Every structure is written in structure tokens, then in C-alpha cells.
Amino acid sequence: MTTAGLKAEGVSWDLSELYSGPDDPHIEADLAEAQRWAEAFAQAYRGKIAGGQLDGPGLAKALAEYEALSDVSHRPSFYASLLFAAETQNTKVQQLVQRTREAATETANLLIFFSLELIAVEEQQLAPLLTAPEMAEYQHYLETLRRFKPHTLSEKEEQLLNQRNLTGRSAFEQLYEELSGSLRFRLTVNGEEQELTDGEVMALLRQPDRTLREHAFTVFLETHAGHSLVLTSIFNNLLLDHKVECALRQYDDVVLPTHLANEIAPQTVEAMMQAVERHYPLAQEYFRLKARLLGFDRLKNTDLYAPIDAQAEAIPFPQAQTLIQTSFGRFSEQFAAIAADFFTRRWIDAEVRGGKRGGAFCAALSPRHHPYVLCSYNGTGRDVATVAHELGHGIHYWLSRRQKLLNYDAPLVLAETASVFAEILLTRHLLAEAQSPAVRRSLLC
């Protein structure tokens, strides 16, 4: 599991479509252009919505310019965030993250009047504007935005919160990523002392050797415990930051901002949670079944991801690519073709290396740019599913290019449907190709 050939060696993304590197002069040029454009936009449109000086076509034109400006203003910070995810210990990248974040905040504060006016305008004043054909594609955005009206502050207060985030939430999130990316885990694997990344250690929890799994988990916890003071401070401050902002915005419940962003009613989430709780016995029966298949009386937490098939071989990254494209192709040739672009055009960073942030994600800037996927591929079946999952997001973004920028990002409950669907396609393909009941059992358990 720790041989280089399994770990997508050399599979890194190409970000040159955005910028050539952290020193690219186009970054500063775009930051300056965004600032200049935002000032001009504010001069042109401040007070126009509140004052009723825009008709439907005029508002659509303003929204279109706002989208174009947002694309330019977000590009430097988006690029910096991708660089940082791949190289959390690179000081030049860290500096770029801070520089672009500060510039993005300045630009956002110049533009915040626009969304505030869209939120504040009375329904009877807005309704006639929405009848213009040019406004049809912006109605969903406006409906979603205006749901936040009871929790929106004054322009000055919103600007202060944005500035506070530079040394508050955003700063603590970056500190966590830098600290996590710096951690190394020393343990013995197959008689050999190794220094592993967090992704490599977590991959060991899917090894058939129970002792190795327990050892890996112990080292993982102990290494983090060595930094418990900093980690505890980070988590507590993030919780307090969220609590304070919810109080300022007069939310009755700290989860309500998430529900609004996800465009889902709290009652729906509560109903789902209750349904899950009612079916706890089903999950418990699964765990009892897995314990029997593994030959244990009871499962430990380190057994949850243990493979049923102890002889299962690691999966090289090229084989994972073939499995994913084939499984997607059984559903749709277009699905498979889009996925192929991620592999062949270097839209994926899958290599395991020190300093890379943990976990996996798919990120997209705008309909004008293709998405990017990051993961750390260790050759497990779960890693194959993770790549498929993130490609589900990527394909969803790709197919959403016809949308306006303001409608481009899907709420979480919709976005995860696309990614889990991609995992289902992979699983169904593997089950269909399974040569024995034992293989099918290992896929299901």
C-alpha cells in the first residue's frame, strides 16, 4: 500500500489556465482591475435599485456586469486557494493567500451595497422588474438571496464583519490547514519505520491486519494530541465566531444559516434526522454482520473500514481511471468523456505528498473555467470511490456551465446527490463484474 506506483505519483493538476505561478504579474493586474472595476460599478449603481431607477432590462444588465466583475475579482484568491491546498507549507503560497484574501475583502466591501439593495427592495417594487425576459435567469438567485433579509446587517456592519474575518474565521481555518499539512506520523509498517502523511495513515485503517489498524489509529490520535493546545484553540474560536455572528444576525438556531444556504427547510432536515434515528437498528445489524464476517465478537472503531476480503489487491491509479470511466460509460458516453478530460487534461491532483491538505474536494470558479479535483490516492477501493465522488461534482459543474454565475454553485443537498450518484455508478459496475459471491460481499461490506 505504500509503494510509489500505487499513489498516483506525478498526477498533479495544471493550473496554468488561471495563472503561470504565484509570481505571475497577471495576479496583481487582476487585483487592481477588480478594485478599479468595483469602484466604477459602485459609482454607476449605488442607490439605483433602492431609488427605483432601474427597469427590468437595466437590472439584468447590472447583474450581468456584477457577474463578470465577480469572475475577475475571485480568480486570484481561487488560484491561491488551489495552490495552498496542494502546498500548505510553501511560504510564498501562504503569502499569496493572505494578499489575495485581503484584496478580495476590499473588493467585496465595495460591492456589498449591491446585494444589500437587492435584499432590501420591497416586493412590490421588485415584482414588475422580474417580468422582463432578461430577468428570467436571475429569479432563483434573487429568491435565495432575499431569504437572508431578516438576518442582514447595515452596509457598515457587513463590511466590518468581512474585515474581521481576515483575522478571525479565515485566519483560524488557514492555521488549521497549515498545521495539519505539517504533521507527519511515524509508525512501523511491515517491520519498516515509516513517516507518513495523514492520508497515508488513514488508508492503513483499510488494511486487513487488525494490529496495524489499531497502531495506525493510535499514532494518528497521539500525534494530534501533541498539538492539542493549538487545535483546541482553533476549534473553540471557530465555534465562538459562528455563535457571535449568529447572535448579531439574530438567528434563533446556529444551524439556520446552513439551512438557508442549502435552500432547505429546517423541518425537512429534522424529518430526515428522525428517520435516520428510527433506523439505527439497521446500521447496528450491519455492524454485527461485519463482525461475524471478520471473525470478531465485537467491532472496534478501527474495524469499521476493515476489508472483508483480506486478499484484496491495491488498485493502481491508471486502473482506477479505467474503472471509473468504464462505470460512467455504462450510464452515459458523455459522462465518461467528461471524466476522461479530468484525467488527460490534468484537472486532478491525486499524488500523495507531504504538505498537501487532507481530504478531497472539487472546486470551480465560474462557468468560464473547468473545475479542479484534489485528493490523495493511496490505492484502496475507498480511494477509487473518492475519485468517482469528486468527479461526480466535477461533471455536475461542467454540465452547469450554461447557468449564470450567480446560479452556478449548487446547494450542498443537490451537489452531494451528483457525487453520490457517481459512486453508485462505480459500485454497480463493480458488482456486475464481480466473479464470485466473496468479491460481491467485499464490495458491499
Question: PLM features: residue spans?
Answer:
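Long, K/E/R/D-enriched contiguous segments that form extended
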Residues: 289, 293-330, 336, 373, ...
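An active-site-proximal "capping" alpha-helix that borders the catalytic cofactor pocket
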Residues: 391, 414-427
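Long, amphipathic alpha-helical stalk/connector segments used for oligomerization, subunit docking
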Residues: 428-445
